[in-house]
């Protein structure tokens, strides 16, 4: 891809219907405007956009892409106009903006609007490259920055609108020759109009020139008085409106107070009657329970072996924003959770089941947590890694780790691995210090998933899983996937498992590296995976955008249970001593056990 503002002409420039500007996008996401009120903005792509970036409803590049309840992406306007999905015929309801697709579209290169003109086909909203115009190609997301300062932008002479239209690059030369330069004191009555030479001569004899300081001071005072009067008018109007509202509220309160006293009297009588009835019912229930206990004591209890079912045993509440990561410190029965509220909470999972402490230090969303020894490492959208001492729960070091958010962390062999945009950094752990050992490159997108198992590091990015030898830090194998970016990875004794952006879970044989199965069932991005292994079986847990957790038996590759207790997307998982912890966008952490 060429850099922004690089002169380039494409012989196969593609003309498509114009996209809306960013400001119009935000307005039209709230209001639905008729077609005739839209003015097409010139848009000519330098190269043919990918078909994956085109809406299946309007067949054009996405405009304000959104994800619908069926899991597909459409233009917001198309999704609001259409009733059913063209792929699976499901009802269309907008769920959330598709930020990832919007960012990809913003990276596409287009021709400057001042280098385009209407195509000769006569179709409205269709444009082609103008060889006489601006030669630059720019990223779609940066078009405003370039076009606002483009030398080919049409401008008007500031001296006289009757001057012929100009290009910005010709304005300075025109001003030197313009015959319509007015005296700076024209607003006070000076009638002079001339060119640059006569303008300078006129100023020497202009009767207003000697009074310019006095005139300016007078203008300033008039302006201040006008502003003060406007403010007073606003204050008077506000006070009048408040006075009217207060009068209305007082009248309403008087009326409602009388009604509430009447209702209160009625409720007191009714509560007294209900209380007597509840006491009678409680007495009857106690008698029945005593009778049932007596009958049970006369019998013999038999054994019952139910199917292993996970149930929600409790909920940790305290975060003020979505929970994005979880980590368990088994030696102390502590659970750490990172959130959009920029904090890390420490939960006791053994005795009190309460928040022990809230760790503060990050300036952005906490996206990743990892434990090595007695140290907790946290990665954030503020591009830093903070080192915490678990013994006293204090911050001991802060490292500026990446130029972009730190998405994931994992430790192995006394090294810490951190994932960000197109890079994995390897850090030697030396006490409380992190020494950069190497940066692993050659990655095609965000690294959102890292797992260390035995002597290998597994990293997930866009449709790719790379396997690295931890001892040599060399990439020894690449697994190709489908379904968009890899958001989660888990490794069992026999399988490599990954969750993707487009709802899928792929499974590979760990020895042959051959894909053996694709697990389906989720209807949203698979954000997290976790494994619980016993001598008898291995279970994989998946957490998804669709607010559910699924339990998969790796013996027969089927879903044995679906857990639905969260009120938002489930984003993080952690396991400890047969227990499963799940964090979600609803700001809670839930505990699951058999």
Curated annotation (Swiss-Prot):
Ubiquitously expressed. Expression is relatively high in heart, liver, kidney, testis, prostate, thyroid, and salivary gland. WD repeats lie at residues 318-357, 361-398, 401-437, 439-478, 481-518, 521-562, 565-593. Phosphorylated by MAP3K3. Ubiquitinates itself upon phosphorylation. One of its GO terms (biological process) is positive regulation of protein sumoylation. Pathway: Protein modification; protein ubiquitination. It is an enzyme of class 2 (transferase). Keywords: Apoptosis, Cytoplasm, Cytoplasmic vesicle, Metal-binding, Nucleus, Phosphoprotein, Repeat, Transcription, Transcription regulation, Transferase, Ubl conjugation, Ubl conjugation pathway, WD repeat, Zinc, Zinc-finger. Its main location: cytoplasm. Residues 15-29 have a biased composition (Low complexity). It holds the Pfam family zf-RING_UBOX. A zinc finger (TRAF-type) spans 146-216. PANTHER family: E3 UBIQUITIN-PROTEIN LIGASE TRAF7, WD40 REPEAT PROTEIN. This is E3 ubiquitin-protein ligase TRAF7. It comes from Mus musculus (Mouse). The lineage of its organism: Eukaryota, Metazoa, Chordata, Craniata, Vertebrata. The gene is Traf7.
């Amino acid at each position: 891809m060429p850099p922004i503002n690089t002169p380039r002409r494409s012989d196969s420039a593609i003309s498509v219907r114009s996209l809306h500007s960013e400001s119009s996008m935000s307005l039209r996401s709230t209001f639905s405007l008729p077609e005739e009120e839209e003015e097409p903005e010139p848009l000519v792509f330098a190269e043919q956009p990918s078909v994956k970036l085109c809406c299946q409803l309007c067949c054009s590049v996405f405009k304000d892409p959104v994800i619908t309840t069926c899991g597909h992406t459409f233009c917001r306007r198309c999704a609001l106009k259409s009733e059913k999905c063209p792929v699976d015929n499901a009802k269309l309801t907008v769920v959330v903006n598709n930020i990832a697709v919007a960012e990809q579209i913003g990276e596409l290169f287009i021709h400057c609007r001042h280098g385009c003109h209407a195509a000769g086909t006569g179709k409205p909203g269709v444009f082609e490259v103008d060889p006489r115009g601006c030669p630059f190609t720019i990223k779609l997301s940066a078009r405003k920055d370039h076009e606002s300062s483009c030398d080919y932008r049409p401008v008007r002479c500031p001296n006289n609108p009757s001057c012929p239209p100009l290009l910005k690059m010709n304005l300075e030369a025109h001003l030197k020759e313009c015959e319509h330069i007015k005296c700076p004191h024209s607003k006070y009555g000076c009638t002079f109009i001339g060119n640059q030479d006569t303008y300078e001569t006129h100023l020497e004899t202009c009767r207003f020139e000697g009074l310019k300081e006095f005139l300016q001071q007078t203008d300033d005072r008039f302006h201040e008085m006008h502003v003060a009067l406007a403010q007073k008018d606003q204050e008077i109007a506000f006070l009048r409106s408040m006075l009217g509202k207060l009068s209305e509220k007082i009248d309403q309160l008087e009326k409602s107070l009388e009604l509430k006293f009447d209702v209160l009297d009625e409720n007191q009588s009714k509560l007294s009657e209900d209380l007597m009835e509840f006491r009678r019912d409680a007495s009857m229930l106690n008698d029945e329970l005593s009778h049932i206990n007596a009958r049970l004591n006369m019998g013999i209890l038999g054994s019952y072996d139910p199917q292993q079912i996970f149930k929600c045993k409790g909920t940790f509440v305290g975060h003020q924003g979505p929970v994005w990561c979880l980590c368990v410190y088994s030696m102390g029965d502590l659970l750490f959770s990172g959130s959009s509220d920029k904090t890390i909470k420490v939960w006791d999972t053994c005795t009190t089941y309460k928040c022990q402490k809230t760790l503060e230090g990050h300036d952005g969303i906490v996206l990743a947590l990892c434990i090595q020894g007695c140290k907790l490492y946290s990665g954030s959208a503020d591009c830093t890694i903070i080192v915490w001492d678990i013994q006293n729960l204090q911050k001991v070091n802060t490292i500026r780790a990446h130029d972009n958010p730190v998405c994931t962390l994992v430790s192995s062999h006394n090294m810490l691995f951190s994932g960000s945009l197109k890079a994995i950094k390897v850090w030697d752990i030396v006490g409380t210090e992190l020494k950069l050992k190497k940066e692993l490159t050659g990655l095609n997108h965000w690294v959102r998933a890292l797992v260390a198992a035995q002597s290998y590091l597994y990293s997930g990015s866009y449709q790719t899983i790379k396997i690295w030898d931890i001892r040599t830090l060399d990439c020894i194998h690449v697994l190709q996937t489908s379904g968009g970016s890899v958001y989660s990875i888990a490794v069992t004794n026999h399988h490599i498992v990954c969750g993707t952006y487009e709802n899928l879970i792929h499974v590979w044989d760990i020895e042959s590296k051959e894909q053996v199965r694709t697990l389906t069932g989720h209807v949203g991005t698979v954000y997290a995976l976790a494994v619980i292994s016993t001598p008898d079986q291995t279970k994989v847990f998946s957490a998804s955008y669709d607010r559910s957790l699924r339990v998969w038996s790796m013996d027969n590759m089927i879903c044995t249970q679906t857990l639905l207790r969260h009120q938002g997307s489930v984003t993080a998982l952690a396991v400890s001593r047969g227990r499963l912890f799940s964090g979600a966008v609803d700001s809670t952490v839930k505990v699951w056990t058999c």
